[in-house]
């Protein structure tokens, strides 16, 4: 039975009692729990701005530890080279983090969430670019789905939308660069702890010159091991104690920078003249171009501003960046350049050499803490991004532990933490110096910048509907700038740049494999859905018994009867008294309000069977409830649906009988009588037990498939599926209530 709404006939009392699901008009609007607009009061914004200092800026704030040594690995050839490089770093900080991210990209958030997947989800709401065809009309009624169709006046946006939806190549390209960006962030996550901790610990050689670099490495390794070991406790346990530490760090580096500027050479301020950048390139040619790979390290961690937006708001990040981060690091870089003008031989360890002697130990301790916090922020960002990829079927199933009751984005992924931890320790031992790690570091950073630029261009065309000259200027300026940096970094590919690149490609290949088979499996089920007449014949068989209890059969399909159902009935010729085809569906939005979670439909014949379809909708940051809580909520909403269905049936009967709407109290009374028995039956069957049914699909490449497809499906995907988390564990389904049905899909 399908239920449809007739707004004109429904009385106010009926409207009040209806649940707003897929069969009743627009969903009830609820307010988003995070404000990212202008409505935030300034006291709250200032508080968030302070907190963001500790969470967002750890990485970019610790870059002064190693930027000059990475930019001048062979020493300073000419005193004015320092002015040119300083000018280059200042304008890089202004152009990419400040102009691009702080004042443009942050506004392309997905209901307050940022990052590569947030951009992809934002685009996918305005154009059907997702590979799995599980869109439903009612999804647009969810409160924070909030799409605005391109207006007829702006034909360009309609044209872009049409091209994206009609081109498989465009869909694949968008998805590919999205997972590449995610993979690059993961590659960045392996290098940030290594270079940050190693550069901070290296300062100890100033007071203990007898220590070798290898000994410094072995001091750094235990710190890294402790860092990765405590991830399971979550950042919330020490959370916003980060802000005071990083604030002290910024005060120290700004003060020391101002001191060096005043004591050594105040004229270094002429670096604000961009002509010194041109002079630097004229004087050094190819060497200047190669040095870009070191200079770009001054903006590592910039993507974290966007990825961590969900914890703060736009104004808070704009305030903390322009008033705290930029002045502090700019003063630090200017002070270091002023110091190096007098002592160019100290470029290999600029940060610690430029410290006033009495401040060495306090700064050393704070530097170690800041390096750990920088690593922590990068790891938290990597976990958060992957947790968004999981619900969209873009990453193999792994355990996601929510470490904070207050901040939903704070998660921990044990398998990924172990992988990054091993890689980070191995990189530290293998590369040993910050200069060597710096060669490998930049490639991930700049490629993520470039990917964001391309996705932002699509957002401007499709969603913001910005004028073409502005879009062209944005694309040309940032693509050209990022290409210059990327080309320089790639020149160091053989010196270490290959490492994060290969790591990212392997991770990307695993994500692509998982998603490819996931999509193919969905299409197979969609192509083999059970026709209604076959469903009726199946339930009418004499050997099919009606057994007590509630059965939940999990399926990815949001429409139709999955092919595993006939298999189940053949093996166990019985159907539960209350049977629900259960689909867990993730929408391309961060959150779905609990009131809008479920949509129901009655399916199959009524005779002796109560069979329903239920789609439970989640955002990509919504945690799944435990099995017990989920089942209780589901059955509660099912009883509400049964009641609303009865209300609607009575209302339709009243209208069909010429009552013209009739007495609302009479309608409700008849509805209550119709629904009471069915609600009692649902309660009774729930008391008798709940059984979870799942199809254990063995996916194989169809006969005649190419060798590559056989390898991807039969070996890579199968090995991933068997060695990673099982689906019932991801759903927290108790084993003693689980029944699996084996089935083979040839795709």
UniProtKB/Swiss-Prot annotation:
One cellular component term from this protein's GO annotations in UniProt? membrane
Keywords attached to this Swiss-Prot or TrEMBL record, sorted alphabetically, are: Ion transport, Membrane, Potassium, Potassium transport, Transmembrane, Transmembrane helix, Transport
Entry membrane topology: Multi-pass membrane protein
Would you say which domain of life the source belongs to? Eukaryota
Q: Ranges in the Extracellular compartment?
A: 69-84, 193-209, 259-288, 340-353, 432-442, 491-496
Chain segments annotated as transmembrane: 48-68, 85-105, 172-192, 210-230, 238-258, 289-309, 319-339, 354-374, 411-431, 443-463, 470-490, 497-517
Q: Which GO terms describe its biological process?
A: potassium ion transport
Does this UniProt record's set of keywords contain Cytoplasm? Answer: no
- Entry-linked InterPro entries: K+_transporter, K_trans_C, K_trans_N
Q: Where is this protein found?
A: Membrane
Does Ion transport show up as a keyword for this record? yes
GO MF annotation list: potassium ion transmembrane transporter activity
- Regions of this protein lying in the Cytoplasmic compartment: 1-47, 106-171, 231-237, 310-318, 375-410, 464-469, 518-747
User: Tell me, what does this protein do in biology?
Assistant: High-affinity potassium transporter.
Q: Which PANTHER family match?
A: OSMOTIC STRESS POTASSIUM TRANSPORTER, POTASSIUM TRANSPORTER 19
Question: Family per UniProt?
Answer: Belongs to the HAK/KUP transporter (TC 2.A.72.3) family.
Q: What is this protein called?
A: Potassium transporter 20
Native organism is: Oryza sativa subsp. japonica (Rice)
